[in-house]
Amino acid sequence: MATSANEMKRNDAREPGHAPPPSPGVLPALDTDVLSNDAFAFWKLPEKWREALGSAIVRSRKEAEWYLFESYRPSSSGRQPRKIRAYYAIKPFIPTALRQRMRSLAVRACSVPSFPAWPCESALLELWSEWLEGALATLGQSDLWHIGFWPDGRNCCLVLTHDVEGPLGLERMEAMADVEEKFGFRSVWNIPLDQYPVDWHMVERVRARGFEFGAHGLRHDGCLFRSLKDFTELAPRLESLAREHQMRGFRSPSTLRNIDWLCTLNFDFDSTMADSDPFEPQPGGSCSIFPFFLNQRMVELPYTLPQDHTLTNLLRRDPLPVWMAKVEWIAKRGGMILTLTHPDYTGDAANLHKYAELLKRLNDLEFAWRALPSEVAAWWHKRAALQLVEGRDGPSVSGGDADRVVVKRVSAEPMMRGKFSCSES
């Protein structure tokens, strides 16, 4: 398949300011320890076509991981940028209200980068869809079977996540969980494991109701990814406390990250990365509204809705219109709607009604798969292990448990219909 034609098409069609697709000289080397993030594995096409698409498959993985692993960002020695280290050095001495005011002024004074675009970045979606169009042309086919992205043929996926920043957020957790239960949802609560006293009896009460808990690092002090020395010293305690409290998922405090180091942590899934978030201390994003693999074990579940704190406290915007524009954009493309809210902020009376309104509207999404992060990670592993075989009697699935697996035509996928533009910015 001639990928150069697709690259030319992508360059010609891209809006001004967007990052160009990766060129061969900057593509990351393939890591054989990573379960494949190539286009063939993404679409899960019939195995009989793999050989004919061989070189295009390899190329697609390199291109995809250029986005997924943020290879478009300037390389560094591994140390945090100086401004992040300086911020965390003075953070304890600045009152919270003043700190948020200063961050809000700084964020609103800066222009939003054109890539990754916010709140919607379509570069990777374009790569997936254009690769498939090229594959169809190479194979002389007008349509192909594939393993559907979500269980039971669901149209999209819906995941609720929270980061519990402090004791106030912990106090508000049960009331916020009540609101979610009212609409038939369950969520995950990520807790810093060495920052403040945690009422583990309350945690177990909420867990018994079907909610999950994850590790939100040790402290909000910027230390975990500050340097390799810090990471090497802190990671064992983080993993030990997470095991003690039966936490198999992770999100880094303030979404600070070094992807190479992150991949060494002993968790089943991570949700540190966004698809696009220019407002975090470490801006960027994976450009993905679907899960992907960090290595053989760990699945990345990028958060795909803007954070409540970002919209309400920093940008001073009504979150609901931005949330719903992004929800509609993701749902129309069959992706994963993954929220990131904080009971510390959204759990108060002034904001909880807006969160309830979000849940009410999410409840109206037709044929969406409501799942906990652990369920999505398990599903993505299961789907990756399966193979699609075409025989005289039609397509069939082999290689593992096919329960809840639905085989569909790629032409039926929302991603293959319509444009990728987003109405809210």
Regions found by a protein language model. Give the residues of each.
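Conserved beta-strand positions
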Residues: 215, 252, 339-341
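An active-site-proximal "capping" alpha-helix that borders the catalytic cofactor pocket
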Residues: 231-242
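Conserved residues at the C-terminal ends of beta-strands
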Residues: 253, 273-275, 304, 342
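Terminal accessory/targeting
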Residues: 1-190, 195-198, 243-244, 263-266, ...
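Glycine-rich phosphate-binding "P-loop"
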Residues: 160-165, 213-229
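Acidic, His- and aromatic-enriched active-site or binding-groove loops in soluble protein domains
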Residues: 210-220, 267-284, 293
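Short, solvent-exposed turn/loop segments enriched in Gly/Ser/Thr/Pro and often Arg
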Residues: 191-199, 248-258, 275-276
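Metal-dependent catalytic neighborhoods of phosphoester/phosphodiester hydrolases
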Residues: 201-202, 225-232, 261-263
